[in-house]
C-alpha cells in the first residue's frame, strides 16, 4: 500500500511544481511584454510629437529606454534560470553570467536613481527660478548633460564587483543583486549611496512643496494710491502690471520711472521670461508625474534594499525567503510601471497619444472635442 501511494504523491507534487513554474514564467512574460510595449510606445510618442521636444520629456525618454533595456536584458535571463532550476538535471547559471546580469541590474538601478535626482533639481528650478531655467536649462543640451552624467555615475557605482550575483538556491532571482562575502564594506557603501541619492531626491521635492505652499499664502491688500503722471503707474499702490508688461515687451510709451535703465524684452528667445498661470500649471503637472515615478521607485526598490542591508549587516540567511522573493518581484514590476504612471498623471501625453493613435479614441470623445476645435479657430 505504501509503495502504491508514493507514485501518486510524487505525481501530484510534480504537477504543483509545474503549475507554479508555469505561473511564474507567465507572469515574467507578461511583465516583459508590458514593459517593452509601454516604454517603446512612449519613446516613439516623444520622438514623433514635436510639442514634446522639451527637456523634461527628453529625460523621460531616457528613463523609458533604460527600463525597456533592463526588462529585455534581465527578465529573459531570470525566466531561463527558473526553467533550469525546475528541470530534473538543471545546471546552475554560470558565475560570469550572474556577475554580468547583477552588474546590469545595478547599472539600471543607479541610473534611474541619479536621473530622478537630476529631474527633481530641474523641476525645482523650473518653478522657483523660472527665468534662469528658461534661459539656461530648457533646451536639449541640459537634458543631454544630465543623461550623460546619470549614465556615468551609474557606471561608476555599479562597475566594482562588490555587488555580485546571487547563489543558485534563489530560484526567483538567481542573478539578482547580492553582496560577496568578502566585499561587505563595499556593498554597504554602495547601498548607502543609493539610499542617499533617493533621500536627496525626496528632499528636493519637499523643498519644492514648501516653496509652492509659501507662495500661496493670502496677504491683506493695502489700498495705497498709486502715483501716475502718464499711462504708467508706480509707487506703493501700483500693482506692477504696467511695469511687468513693459519689461516683457508688451508696453508702449515712455519708460516707467521705476524701470529707467532696464531694456524691454524683444521678440526673440528671451521675450517670454515670466511664468504665467498656464505655464505654472504645466510645470506642476510635470512635477506631480515625476514625483509619482520617484515615489514608486522608492516603494518598489525599498524592500529589496532593506533585504540587502540585512544580508550585509547580519548574515545572508537572515532574510526570509518569502520576503526576498516578494521584494525581487517588486523590482521586476518597476521596469514596466513608469508608462502607466505617465499616462495617468500627464494630460499632455494623453492628448498626444490620442492625436497619434486616433483608433484608440472613442466616437463620443471625438464628438466632445469638436466644439473645442471650432472654438479654437474663432467660430
UniProtKB/Swiss-Prot annotation:
Which Gene Ontology terms cover its molecular function? G protein-coupled receptor activity
- Glycosylation positions? 3
Kindly give the membrane topology term recorded for this protein. Multi-pass membrane protein
Biological process terms from the Gene Ontology for this record are:
positive regulation of insulin secretion involved in cellular response to glucose stimulus; positive regulation of phospholipase C-activating G protein-coupled receptor signaling pathway
> Which residue windows are coiled coil?
none
UniProtKB keywords? Cell membrane, Disulfide bond, G-protein coupled receptor, Glycoprotein, Membrane, Receptor, Transducer, Transmembrane, Transmembrane helix
Q: Pfam families recorded for this chain?
A: 7tm_1
Membrane-spanning residues: 27-47, 59-79, 101-121, 143-163, 186-206, 290-310, 325-345
Q: Name one GO cellular component term.
A: plasma membrane
Which stretches are Extracellular in the membrane topology? 1-26, 80-100, 164-185, 311-324
- Give the disulfide map: 98-175
Residues assigned to the Cytoplasmic compartment are: 48-58, 122-142, 207-289, 346-379
The keyword Transferase is annotated on this UniProt entry: no
- Classify the main location: membrane
**Localization per record:** Cell membrane
- What family is it from? Belongs to the G-protein coupled receptor 1 family.
Biological role: Orphan receptor. Possible candidate for amine-like G-protein coupled receptor.
Q: What is the protein named?
A: Probable G-protein coupled receptor 27
Instruction: State the organism named in the record.
Output: Mus musculus
- Upper lineage ranks? Eukaryota, Metazoa, Chordata, Craniata, Vertebrata
Q: Tell me what gene encodes this.
A: Gpr27
